[in-house]
């Protein structure tokens, strides 16, 4: 599905959109009152866009959206996602408008400030707050309750006597020693408790302290605590109980047409930090899918929230999940299925997002299936095949300067890779001869097929014949594969071709001239995907084998333990590089003495 096709399917809801580049990295985060209208505005003739926006859109390859209930939700989520991803074009494109935060400075006697800039300066930040007016009101009340200082560091350093703020009971005058650092920090800790949503707990704590002060006849302190409690209760009475005062995850699923999607909203300290999406294929009941999503997500997580909000508990394996959570985290979350209130609103928002994501993925799958079918029919016609090539196998050879030669076999069915059927072969014959290596790989693959036919048994990789075999290379590699098939008496049972990378020439057996398909042909694009996947798979195996060989050699050298072995592997990467390195270059690795380096060089010369 193209970017524009995705945009056409966007809803008219408020939400956040994330542009991604070809690597899948988030390059821009924006918010919208109407997602469809806002995102469409980027698709104008380039000359109508700002230069920076034009550059950003040239890089954009994909878009993800998170639907929110209100524009305010979108504002908060946008800020959190920008902090999380640090997208490069937000730094360039974001307008000067930003949302205010409360900041507790990292000074000896901290201040509480309202700021629109978040920097790594040792301070603690709370927010963002989309309603600046309400924030100013809260700030004034907090200042009247806790009496923290507001003066600049320069003025604070010069003060020897309390200023007017102390006399009108708006500052505790730490500059003049009217309050100890310990007592001042207790006040700041209470501010933190309040800002982190623990206002009720703070009031309970203050009431206990007030009772103790009263019992000890400390009436002045008890009166101060009483005033703080009354002011805090006034603030809390005005506040709507919000999800901002809890850590929770909302976990929802949707499934249709052999496709399942799980979505998690992560809410921490009052902020919706974003969503995590999981996709599953195959027939699955809703309860089974929900269990799978929970185990998959929390299997990777470092923490579990106090509460997990669900749309249903039907078929939820709570006994197993509770045991599993206890074992992994030492505690179990509370599962809730809200029917009304704020939690229900959150749940509705998550369900809207998961259904939108599922619809989008189904459309993408349908488009992919159509393109794959078009590519397969194109190949049948272009290569004059007797059947549509439902099963295509791709082969490639990889080695490093003639050593550690490996071959890969990848399998595509109906145009899609089936990774469970991939296989790799460590080449035993002439290591630095690509033709001999290709001959061996193809011969071994089809001998396995014949053995299965004769002896019975099952092997998803080898028990079926392909409709088409694609060899990475030119005529030489193609001829080697054909020779291998002659030995197995399978020649003519299916079609074999080679694809040479430089000109993307297709070589066919017995044909003098190569075949060239235009770059826009879906058939050629599919062949390129198969070839590139075979190449990637071979290189990955060859790399693992090379590192394993080097690690094995390093184990033989006295004085090189696991830590030094890892350092040498990271620095040199191969026996060839290590052999070419000087003793001085080897001793540059921490912990490698000249004596150890010389022993290693001696062993390398014997190899």
Curated annotation (Swiss-Prot):
Compartments in which it is found: Cytoplasm
Domain GIY-YIG: 12-91
Keyword Disulfide bond included in the entry's annotation: no
Subunit structure: Interacts with UvrB in an incision complex.
Protein name (database record): UvrABC system protein C
NCBIfam families named among the record's database cross-references: PRK00558.1-5, uvrC
MF annotations from Gene Ontology: DNA binding; excinuclease ABC activity
Natural source organism: Carboxydothermus hydrogenoformans (strain ATCC BAA-161 / DSM 6008 / Z-2901)
């Amino acid at each position: 599905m193209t970017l524009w096709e995705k945009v056409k399917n966007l809803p008219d809801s408020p939400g956040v959109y994330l542009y991604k580049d070809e690597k899948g990295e988030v390059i821009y985060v924006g918010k919208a009152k109407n997602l469809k209208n806002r995102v469409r505005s980027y698709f104008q003739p380039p000359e109508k866009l700002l230069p920076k926006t034009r550059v950003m859109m040239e890089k954009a390859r994909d878009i993800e959206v998170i639907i929110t209930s209100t524009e305010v939700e979108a504002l908060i989520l946008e800020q959190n996602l920008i902090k999380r991803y640090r997208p490069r074009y937000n730094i360039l494109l974001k307008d000067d408008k930003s949302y205010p935060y409360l900041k507790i400075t990292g000074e000896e006697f901290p201040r509480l400030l309202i700021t629109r800039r978040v920097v790594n300066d040792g301070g603690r930040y709370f927010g963002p707050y989309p309603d600046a007016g309400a924030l100013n009101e809260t700030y004034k009340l907090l200042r009247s309750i806790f009496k923290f200082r507001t003066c600049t560091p320069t003025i604070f350093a010069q003060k020897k006597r309390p200023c007017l703020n102390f006399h009108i009971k708006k500052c505790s005058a730490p500059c003049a020693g009217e309050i100890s650092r310990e007592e001042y920090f207790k006040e700041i800790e209470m501010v933190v408790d309040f800002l982190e949503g623990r206002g009720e707990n703070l009031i309970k704590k203050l009431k206990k302290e007030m009772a103790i002060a009263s019992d000890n006849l400390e009436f002045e302190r008890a009166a101060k605590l009483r005033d703080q409690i009354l002011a805090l209760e006034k603030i809390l009475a005005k506040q709507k109980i919000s999800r901002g005062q809890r850590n929770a995850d909302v976990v929802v699923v949707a499934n249709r047409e052999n496709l399942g999607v799980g979505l998690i909203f992560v809410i921490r300290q009052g902020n919706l930090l974003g969503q995590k999406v999981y996709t599953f294929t195959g027939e699955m009941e809703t309860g089974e899918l929900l269990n799978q999503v929970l185990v998959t997500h929390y299997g990777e997580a470092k923490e579990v929230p106090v509460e997990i909000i669900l749309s249903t508990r039907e078929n939820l394996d709570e006994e197993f999940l509770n045991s599993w959570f206890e074992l992994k985290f030492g505690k179990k979350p509370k599962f809730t299925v809200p029917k009304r209130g704020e939690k229900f609103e959150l749940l509705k928002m998550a369900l809207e997002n998961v259904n939108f994501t599922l619809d989008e993925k189904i459309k993408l799958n349908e488009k992919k299936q159509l393109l794959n079918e078009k590519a397969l029919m194109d190949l049948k016609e272009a290569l004059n095949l007797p059947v549509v090539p439902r099963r295509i196998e791709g082969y490639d050879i990889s080695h490093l300067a003639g050593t550690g030669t490996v071959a890969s076999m990848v399998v595509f069915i109906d145009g899609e890779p089936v990774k469970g059927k991939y296989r790799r072969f460590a080449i035993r014959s002439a290591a630095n001869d690509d033709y001999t290596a290709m001959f061996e790989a193809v011969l071994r693959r089809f001998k396995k097929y014949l053995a299965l036919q004769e002896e019975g048994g099952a092997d998803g990789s080898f028990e079926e014949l392909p409709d088409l075999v694609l060899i990475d290379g030119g005529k030489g590699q193609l001829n080697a594969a054909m020779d291998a098939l002659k030995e197995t008496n399978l020649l003519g049972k299916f079609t074999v071709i080679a694809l040479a990378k430089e000109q993307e020439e297709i070589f066919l057996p017995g044909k003098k001239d190569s075949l060239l398909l235009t770059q826009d042909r879906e058939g050629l694009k599919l062949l390129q995907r198969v070839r590139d996947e075979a190449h990637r798979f071979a290189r990955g195996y060859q790399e693992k084998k090379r590192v394993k060989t080097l690690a094995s050699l390093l184990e033989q050298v006295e004085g090189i333990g696991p830590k030094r072995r890892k350092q040498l592997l990271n620095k040199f990467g191969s026996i060839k590089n290590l052999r070419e390195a000087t003793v001085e270059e080897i001793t540059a690795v921490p912990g490698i003495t000249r004596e150890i380096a010389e022993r290693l060089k001696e062993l390398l010369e014997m190899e």
